Regions:
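The feature marks the mature, well-folded catalytic cores of soluble enzymes
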Residues: 1-219
Length: 219
């Protein structure tokens, strides 16, 4: 087996050396020129995401914690998981009023409160890197301070989107944020609540992840 393997690899190397492949530079002109106006970007994102059951709520930089709290109270949420080490988490802690859903800090390894996360958390709040007009997608950048489980496990995912953090294309997101120089373990592109058509090819939402995706547009 060893001789056969060596022979095959030697043959492949010889073929590669005898027929080198010329590298062709990529042409990103189409992506560079695909543009929408500022107002049109947000309307396009909303239209495309609402088509797959995403919900939108408007807020301002001053009142978004109160808007989120009121929305979750009306939705019947009892517990809200958040990342205390983030800027958004600090705002929640300082602004959260009594009488609303209970804030639950995500400041422990998941193994220490796995059961609570999967059975006792109603909503999770995350920041976003922005949204893409071309595809109608949110961009999440998970980190040690804000792990991806915040957006994947709770039944309701609250995503905070700053109205000026809008991009035309995924290519623009990657280039302007210099992804080539360093990426997290994973970046998430989210267009709506979880869905599947595995069962009799019937489309169903909220089967293996959040049942609702709420985008809070912060103007």
């Amino acid at each position: 087996m060893s001789d056969a393997r060596s022979s095959i690899l030697a043959s492949l190397r010889a073929s590669r050396d005898a027929h080198p492949v010329e590298t062709v530079a990529s042409d990103f002109t189409v992506l560079r020129e695909k543009r929408w106006g500022p107002a049109e970007r947000l309307e396009r994102v909303k239209r495309m995401m609402e088509a797959v059951h995403t919900e939108f709520v408007d807020a301002t930089e001053q009142d978004w914690p109160a808007v989120v709290q009121a929305f979750l109270k009306d939705a019947g949420a009892k517990t809200v998981l958040y990342a205390p080490a983030t800027e958004a988490g600090a705002r929640l802690e300082s602004s959260w009023a009594d009488g609303g859903p209970e804030l639950v800090r995500y400041d422990r390894p998941v193994d220490e409160f796995k059961e609570e996360m999967f059975t006792g958390i109603d909503a999770g709040i995350t920041q976003t890197l922005g949204a893409i007009a071309d595809t109608g997608s949110l961009v999440l950048w998970p980190s040690a301070d804000e792990p991806r489980l915040l957006s994947l496990v709770p039944h309701i995912h609250i995503a905070l989107l700053k109205a000026d953090a809008l991009y035309d294309t995924f290519w623009q997101v990657m280039t302007e944020n210099r992804w080539a120089e360093g990426m997290p373990t994973n970046a998430l592109l989210i267009s709506g609540p979880s869905k599947t058509a595995d069962i009799e090819q019937t489309l169903a939402y909220g089967v293996h992840g959040p049942k609702r995706l709420i985008v809070v547009v912060i103007r």
